[in-house]
């Protein structure tokens, strides 16, 4: 999936997909509320999304993702979940922080980084022998380091 779309485009697609899932329809008013922008700003953005064939929208009508828009939304959801899983399951961050940071990070990583992240998560989850031990050790080291303990001291224990 080509993620060459800018961050703002990606964020609009995610909001529209969320609104479609929640309300079955996406409206300019609802998008403006979620983005914290004016309706006219949303209208300008929607015309750009329509030019990219990511949405179908008629003036004063509902906004609908096209097949390409749905593919992009699905891919963004997968990226978001992968980053959130890393932050929560591996690094042990609180869900609220992981959610907030995943929203930012998902737009910045390259396809190569995403692939490497997916391979890493798969490996960590599939290793029946080391999975729990690895995660415990990572979290233990993270806690020790946050207290100012150098890694060398942690490793010698």
Regions found by a protein language model. Give the residues of each.
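C-terminal regulatory/oligomerization modules of transcriptional regulators
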Residues: 104-157
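Key DNA-contact positions within bacterial/archaeal DNA-binding proteins
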Residues: 40, 96
């Amino acid at each position: 999936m080509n993620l060459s779309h800018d961050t703002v485009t990606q964020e609009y697609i995610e909001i529209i997909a969320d609104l479609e899932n929640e309300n079955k329809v996406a409206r300019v008013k609802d998008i403006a509320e979620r983005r914290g922008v004016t309706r006219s700003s949303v209208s300008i953005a929607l015309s750009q999304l329509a030019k990219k064939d990511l949405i179908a929208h008629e003036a004063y009508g509902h906004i609908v993702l096209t097949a390409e828009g749905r593919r992009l939304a699905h891919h963004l959801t997968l990226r978001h979940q992968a980053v959130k899983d890393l932050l929560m399951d591996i690094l042990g961050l609180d869900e609220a922080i992981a959610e907030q940071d995943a929203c930012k990070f998902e737009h910045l990583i390259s396809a190569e980084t995403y692939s490497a992240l997916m391979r890493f998560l798969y490996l960590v989850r599939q290793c029946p022998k080391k999975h729990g031990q690895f995660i415990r050790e990572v979290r233990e080291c993270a806690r020790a380091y946050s207290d100012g303990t150098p890694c060398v001291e942690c490793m010698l224990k």
